[in-house]
């Protein structure tokens, strides 16, 4: 029982960034892009992008901004999710790898996420279907048109953000000095991964209370099933066994986790977010990436299982690419290892050093 409550308290603090900080005060802002055109040709009269920044931009003698770091969140997440003791507390503080007194840190809420424009704002299923390319293009506009950032020292991201890091690399190959994708693969979403994402959507749509997206209350049965599917995608068998070593504790932990996610998730937003990966496929474009790149996965990541051998094949296409597979330890946490700099900080230090 005590283990479960401690697990949930830590998870709550981690998600909400409520642990004391050792880095500069984050500043929040919004940028509205007029008549944004999506990859499918549909347009949104006003696309709002929410963002958080820490620090101040600096320029070199060549006029390029030389200290901007873009960090991208995962599916159903937001930029604020990085502002916790485990991530920001180990990266953004004085003397740390991404010291916010030295770097200009940019945390954005992607299309469909956080405080940026999303289906639940009112359009529901009339909201344009978006892709990772749309997210990257919108963020590029935010950086160049609003924040006046003409160059990035580093692009890094976790999960969906890691996948977007690859897209950034080949879409704007001269825009960054370094790239670090965490918990991702640079290939089409297929096999078990695609089946899991498709199942999330199907479970929601199968609930009669979904009502083709026109629900007044969340379709609890379908959304609960989708949340359960997501939990098993990103969890660690080792860590969950440690947190819930008995049947009673496991069932209690499951109920509490599902209930917590039910309180913050919207069904339409969730479906759109997982469907945004449907056209993702960097593999044919990897040779276009110019910046030094270190990709990091963990051996207990069930979203990107190492036995597929996909990264080892694809990383060869990246001229300055390197792949690190973290072994399973008591500190790794499955897919979520991407948010623990203590596990991969040494490789970030290496990347920053070789890309000066």
Regions found by a protein language model. Give the residues of each.
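N-terminal cap/lid subdomain of alpha/beta-hydrolase-fold enzymes
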Residues: 52-121
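Conserved acidic catalytic loop of the alpha/beta-hydrolase fold
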Residues: 133-154
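Conserved hydrolase catalytic core segment
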Residues: 150-193
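Active-site nucleophile elbow and catalytic-triad environment of alpha/beta-hydrolase enzymes
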Residues: 269-285
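Short beta-strand/loop motif that positions the catalytic acidic residue
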Residues: 289, 295-297
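Conserved alpha/beta-hydrolase "acid-adjacent" motif
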Residues: 302-309
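Catalytic active-site module of serine/aspartate enzymes centered on a nucleophile-bearing elbow/loop
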Residues: 318-356
